[in-house]
Amino acid sequence: VYIIGRDDETNQGRKSLQQLTAGLDPSKPILVLDHQPHHLEQAELAGVDFQLSGHTHRGQVFPLNLLVDRMYERSHGYHRRGKTQYYVSSGIGIWGGKYRIGTQSEYVVIHLSGRAD
């Protein structure tokens, strides 16, 4: 199993998923931890099996959740593109104000199992 953690998008030295997965054995599972769920297609193109992201807080406050839903292909929850699976957690934390209105915080337990060949 490969577990890849990516630098934040604000880091100018952030490597592409293609760079991070180059040379890995594609027969082994590739898991990516990427704070922001931008450009989900990159994980699919890089042969990533599962990506876990957060960052969005699902908008945290209504009506910002409507805007966040438009900003991201998936602002929260499970998603699949081709063979790549994604989960974007709305998290338990907050940003700015100490409240959430119209969105749910969450913690996620993910069970991983072997591939069915």
Please report, for each region that a protein language model flagged, where it lies by residue.
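Soluble catalytic domains of enzymes that build or remodel membrane lipids, polysaccharides, and related
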Residues: 1-117
